[in-house]
Curated annotation (Swiss-Prot):
PANTHER family: PHAGE INTEGRASE-RELATED, TYROSINE RECOMBINASE XERC. This is Putative tyrosine recombinase CA_C2066. GO terms for cellular component: cytoplasm. PROSITE patterns: CB, TYR_RECOMBINASE. InterPro entries: CB, DNA_brk_join_enz, Integrase-like_cat_sf, Integrase_catalytic, Integrase_recombinase_N, Integrase_SAM-like_N, Recomb_XerD, Tyrosine_recombinase_XerCD. It holds the Pfam family Phage_int_SAM_1.
Length: 292
């Protein structure tokens, strides 16, 4: 089975998926492989009962429905590949009905909380200037962390106030920037040369001059959230989610938000409508209920 897994991943690497997506697929299939080994079950023996048994195993181990669905999708795609190659007669996962996902929406920052977060970096230090520019761009554009960290100096146009961003499958999109983000970038570019000891084209890098990692950015946003006294669960995508919901709150149409976020599927963007409704209901309740 190990050889088949490697052949499969050699195939899907050609699809220009992100490394994070491929890594997630690999973890899912590896875990399923370990499950089969423990059961002493061969790949060709897998049927819908095996899949149901595996789902129960994941549930017992505390996996959320969303995680289980992703696991099953990964396995289904693997078996689809095996079926196409003639290794399996059919795909056992197609007979399995996916569990419905109860969406637990991530926490969204209020505009006041975003202001607190963005005021966190110390504008008198090179690190603070860099951090401020990164956070302002994240909130101004709603781009993904990987998109932010892959930006080069050639992707920004301060004169016309836009950023050129490359998303999934290297698809390019142009995102406008607000005046705050532009101003922070102008200040940052003055100190960037001093920080760029490795002479690289990436717009942002760590204090050693290397390309910043996702973990490095996560530590930055976590630090300022704690220092700002924000109690909500913060992650590297909180500003992206808040960007989308705040646009909805201020009347932006869902199609425009889809284009700004780089979603290929409108259904993904419409999740933010549910997040907005949840936030809006909570706000109305707090303002209007006498015992809120």
């Amino acid at each position: 089975m190990d050889n088949l897994i490697e052949q499969y991943f050699a195939e899907i690497r050609k699809k220009n998926l992100s490394l994070n997506t491929i890594d997630a697929y690999r973890r899912d299939i590896k875990k399923f492989h370990e499950f089969l080994d423990e059961k002493g079950e061969k790949l060709r023996e897998v049927d819908v009962i095996t899949i149901m048994s595996y789902v129960q195993y994941l549930q017992k181990n505390g996996r959320a429905n969303s995680s289980i669905v992703r696991n099953i999708v990964s396995i289904r795609n693997f078996f689809k590949y095996l079926e196409i190659k003639g290794i399996m007669d059919d795909n056992p996962v197609t007979q399995y009905e996916m569990p419905k996902i109860r969406r637990n929406f991530p926490d969204i920052l209020t505009i006041e909380e975003v202001e607190k977060l963005l005021m966190g970096p110390d504008g008198n230090t090179d690190k603070g200037i860099r951090d401020k520019a990164m956070l302002e761009i994240m909130y101004a554009t709603g781009m993904k962390v990987t998109e932010l960290l892959n930006l080069t100096i050639y992707d920004i146009n301060l004169k016309l106030s836009y950023i050129k961003c490359r998303g999934i499958k290297n698809k390019e999109r142009i995102i406008p920037m607000g005046s705050y983000a532009v101003k922070c970038l102008e200040i940052y570019l003055k100190v960037r040369t001093k920080l760029n000891v490795q002479n690289i084209d990436y717009l942002f890098f760590n204090l050693q001059g290397d390309k910043m990692t996702r973990q490095g950015f996560w530590k930055i946003i976590k630090q300022y959230a704690q220092e700002s006294g924000i109690k909500k669960k913060i992650n590297a995508y909180t500003l992206r989610h808040s960007f989308a919901v705040h646009l909805l709150q201020n009347g932006a149409d869902i199609k425009t938000i889809q284009e700004l976020l780089g979603h290929s599927d409108m259904a993904t963007t419409q999740i933010y409508s549910g997040m907005y409704r949840k936030t809006r209901i909570a706000e109305v309740y707090k303002k209007t209920h006498p015992r809120a």
